[in-house]
Structures are given as C-alpha cells and as structure tokens.
C-alpha cells in the first residue's frame, strides 16, 4: 500500500529578498538614478557598463533565435502550421499596432499636451535632428523587405540582424523537417546545443544589475531629471496613454484569452526591470522567449512570434509616433485636419514596421513618418529630442508587454498553449528566474500537465524531488 508523503518533507531553501534578480535590478536602477543626479560627470562616464551589457545580450540573440525557431519548426508534424502561425501572428500585429496608433491619436486630441506652447519654428535648433532625418530617408518599404534576406548565412549572424536570422532559421527548420529521418541526427544535435546556450543566457543575465546601473546613471547624468520638467505634459501624457493601452486594450485581450495582464506582468517582472534600466526591449529578448516557453506556449510559436514582433509589433513605438506628431503640431500651432491625421496614421502604420527594439529607434521612425507627412514640420522634433530618452523606457516596456501577450494569444489561437502549465507558471510553480539556466522544452500535450511539479499548502518539494519529477528540463539540476 502506498503511503502519502508526510508534511515533514524538507522545505526547499528560499531566496533572500536581495538574492532575487528583479530586486537586484531595481536597486541598481535606483543607485544609477542617485549617481547620475548627484554626480552627473561620473554618471556619464558609466555609459560603457550599459553598452557592454547590451552587446553581451546581442551576442547571444542570434543563436537563441536560430535554435528555438529551427528546432521548433523541425519538430512540427505538420509544416502547414508554420504558415498558419505566421498568418495569425501578422493579423494580430497589424490589428493591435493600428489600435496603438489610434489610441495615441485619440489621447493626443483629447489632452492636447502641446497646446499653448506657441513655439516659433525659426527658434529651434534643426541641426540636432538632421542626423535622424537623414537616417529616416534611407528607410523604404522595398528596402526593408529586401534587407530581410541576408547576403550570406554567416553575414546574418555576424551582423546580428533579428529578421535576417529569423528568415534563415525558418527556412532551415522547414528544410530539416522535409528531409525526414536523415535529419534527425542534426535535430538532436541542435536540441542538445540548446542547453548550454540557454545556460549562457542565465550567466549573462547575472550581469543585468551592472548594465542597468550604468545605463541609468548615464541617462540621468547626461540629460538630468530637470530636463523633463519643461515637457512634463508630453511625457506624462505618453506614460498615461501607454498605461491605458496596456491595462485597457491588452488587459481586455488577456482576459478574453483566459489569463490576467497583472499575472503576466508579475511573471515577467525581471525582464521589465531590465528593460527599464537599459531602455532597450532587445536586452530582454532571450529571457522573454524562455519565459514564454516555460509558461506553456509551444516553442515553434514563441520562436516565430516574439522575434517577428520585435519589428512588427511595437505598440509603445506606435503610441509614441502619433502622440509625438500631434504634440509637435500643437506646440507649433500647426492645424491638422482629419485628412492630415488619417494620412499620419497610414504612414505610421508602414514606417513603424521594422523599427528595431533598440534605444533611439523610435525617434528615427518618427522622423521617417514626419518626412512623408508634409503638414507636420520635421524641425519640430528638436522640441522633444531632450526628453526622448525618458520616453524610450516606456516605449520599450510597452513593446515588451505587447510581444509577451502576442505570443500567448497566438499560441492559444493555434491550440499550442498549455493552460495548466500557464496557470502553474503564473502561480510560481515553475522556476521564474531566467538566471537558473534551465529552460524547459514545451512538453507534449498528452503529458504536459502531469509533469508539472506539485506543491501542497503544507509542504514543498526539494530541488532534487523536483528534478526527479520533471523530465522537461534541458539540463539536469
């Protein structure tokens, strides 16, 4: 007769508060603000810390995307799923990117953050924005699409272009699936290679507090908190609009699809704080992909949706573009008719696609939009150049949440979301720290729920018990 486990089973050791990654990043951000404010020269000199961390993360992004996408697609029994997932993802991206643009227009017209400033265009330093405007003129729809195709396979990985790596990874995954039995050894090798690569991601994430500290100290030291005061209405309106979009629009989408936006944000809090510190949603891409897979979304869906979303689903950038354009028009007393605003919306829908998830890309995209919309003066961008960095954090945070929601929603539409695993992950039954270095491969639907670690109210399993009870880790504990 089997006897139940006694409540006296040894409890798993709990982390102290400061040992939690998100607490370390939060403390680092606060220290960075303090150093940048009180010692601005030192703060500016700490910029290499943030730059070095972002470069370290970019170093691993291409291998993570390649391994995740190629193994996910190669493991599909039906290759038509690739087209379905991509199609559903694009429908989602276009729908909610357009909604973000519309929300920015509506809030901008209601609050009118630039009204009453009466800025004279001749008094603005247009030289400050010439560099961004020249970059904007280099962008075109045809050029963007052609740039998705790498010149060489090696070149895509060397340059670290997300869309080029994704393009090759999809083709390679399809080819690997088509060769059948003879490709299984290659697939097995790539699956084995995933373990050390994600372990490396965990190691790199341990440096996140240092990177966040350096980046925040530089931002405050160079631009100063006081620079926000003059344009506080614009910054405040943008943050309010992003808040309404995340908790209103995306919150409703989450509820309709069976989960809570609050639970999702709590689940990805480490990634959000990392983005807050670095102002770049790209810094959290590897760990976000790992988190979404742990939450029950199939690897093939996560690998397609999130990297693609970093170019096609930038909700924060979309809100920023329409709101900033309206602010410039209002501040310079430029009247925008309904037709002008519709043109602004249509142009922004195109120019926002392909905006990279790196710091400052939103400003270049705004320049590209205004250069096509003659009613809004491009020179007016000089007004917001000083506070753009402070809005960059909010753009990146909104982009990150939007892509996290997209991956779960598209996975659910495709029937590739394990609801039991999602609930368990949101409740903390699976390791949430990306620094653990032990990513889960999405389990098969037949046994995914059964393999979850169970935790009763009166006791918890030891780490060894968990390792013995779960076969889904890529590397043993």
Curated annotation (Swiss-Prot):
SUPFAM superfamilies (UniProt xref): Proton glutamate symport protein
PROSITE patterns: NA_DICARBOXYL_SYMP_1 (PS00713), NA_DICARBOXYL_SYMP_2 (PS00714)
Pfam families to which the protein is assigned, alphabetical: SDF (PF00375)
Single Gene Ontology BP annotation: L-aspartate transmembrane transport
Disulfide topology: none
Gene Ontology CC annotations of this record: plasma membrane
Keywords, in A-Z order: Cell inner membrane, Cell membrane, Membrane, Symport, Transmembrane, Transmembrane helix, Transport
Gene Ontology molecular function terms on file: fumarate transmembrane transporter activity; malate:proton symporter activity; succinate transmembrane transporter activity
Membrane topology: Multi-pass membrane protein
Localization: Cell inner membrane
Spans annotated as Disordered: 435-477
InterPro entries (UniProt xref): C4_dicarb_transport, Na-dicarboxylate_symporter, Na-dicarboxylate_symporter_CS, Na:dicarbo_symporter_sf
Predominant subcellular localization, coarse grouping: membrane
Entry superkingdom: Bacteria
Keyword match Ligase: no
Transmembrane segments: 21-39, 59-76, 89-111, 162-179, 200-221, 231-253, 342-364, 368-387
NCBIfam families the UniProt entry points to: PRK01663.1, PRK13027.1
Stated family: Belongs to the dicarboxylate/amino acid:cation symporter (DAACS) (TC 2.A.23) family.
Functional summary from the UniProt entry: Responsible for the transport of dicarboxylates such as succinate, fumarate, and malate from the periplasm across the membrane. This transport system plays an important role in the energy supply of rhizobium-legume symbionts.
Record-given protein name: C4-dicarboxylate transport protein 1
């Amino acid at each position: 007769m089997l006897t139940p486990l006694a409540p006296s089973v040894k409890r798993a050791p709990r982390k102290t508060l400061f040992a939690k990654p998100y607490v370390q990043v939060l403390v680092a951000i606060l220290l960075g603000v303090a150093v940048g404010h009180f010692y601005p020269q030192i703060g500016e000199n700490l910029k290499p810390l943030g730059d070095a961390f972002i470069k370290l993360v970019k170093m691993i992004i291409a291998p993570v995307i390649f391994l995740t996408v190629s193994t996910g697609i190669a493991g599909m029994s039906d290759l038509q799923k690739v087209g379905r997932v991509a199609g559903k993802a694009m429908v989602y991206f276009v729908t909610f990117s357009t909604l973000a643009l519309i929300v920015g227009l509506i809030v901008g017209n209601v609050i009118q953050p630039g009204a009453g400033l009466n800025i004279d265009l001749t008094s603005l330093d247009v030289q400050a924005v010439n560099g961004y405007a020249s970059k904007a003129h280099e962008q075109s729809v045809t050029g963007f699409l052609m740039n998705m195709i790498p010149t060489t396979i090696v070149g895509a990985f060397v340059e670290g272009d997300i869309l080029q790596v994704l393009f090759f990874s999809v083709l390679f995954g399809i080819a690997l699936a088509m060769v059948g039995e003879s490709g299984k050894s290659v697939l097995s090798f790539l699956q084995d290679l995933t373990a050390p690569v994600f372990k490396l991601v965990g190691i790199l994430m341990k440096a996140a507090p240092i990177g966040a500290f350096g980046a925040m100290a530089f931002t405050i030291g160079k631009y100063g908190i006081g620079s926000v005061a003059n344009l506080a209405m614009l910054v405040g309106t943008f943050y309010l609009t992003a808040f309404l979009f995340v908790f209103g629009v995306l919150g409703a989408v989450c509820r309709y699809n069976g989960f809570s936006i609050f639970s999702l944000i709590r689940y990805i809090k480490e990634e959000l704080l990392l983005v807050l510190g670095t102002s770049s949603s790209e810094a959290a891409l590897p760990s976000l992909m790992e988190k979404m897979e742990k939450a029950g979304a199939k690897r093939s869906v996560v690998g397609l949706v999130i990297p693609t979303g970093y170019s096609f689903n930038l909700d924060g950038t979309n809100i920023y573009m329409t709101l900033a354009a309206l602010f410039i028009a209002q501040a310079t007393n430029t009247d925008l008719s309904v037709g002008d605003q519709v043109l602004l919306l249509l142009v922004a829908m195109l120019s926002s696609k392909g905006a990279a998830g790196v710091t400052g890309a939103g400003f270049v995209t705004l320049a590209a939009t205004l250069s096509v919309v003659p009613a809004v003066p491009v020179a007016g961008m000089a007004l917001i150049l000083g506070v753009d960095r402070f809005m960059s954090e909010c753009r990146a945070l909104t982009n990150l949440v939007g892509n996290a929601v997209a991956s779960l929603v598209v996975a659910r539409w495709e029937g590739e979301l394990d609801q039991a695993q999602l609930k368990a992950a949101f409740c903390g039954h699976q390791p949430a720290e990306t620094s653990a270095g032990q990513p889960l491969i999405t389990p098969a639907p037949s046994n995914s729920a059964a393999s979850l670690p169970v935790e009763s109210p009166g006791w918890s399993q030891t780490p060894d018990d968990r390792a013995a009870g779960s076969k889904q880790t890529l590397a043993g504990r």
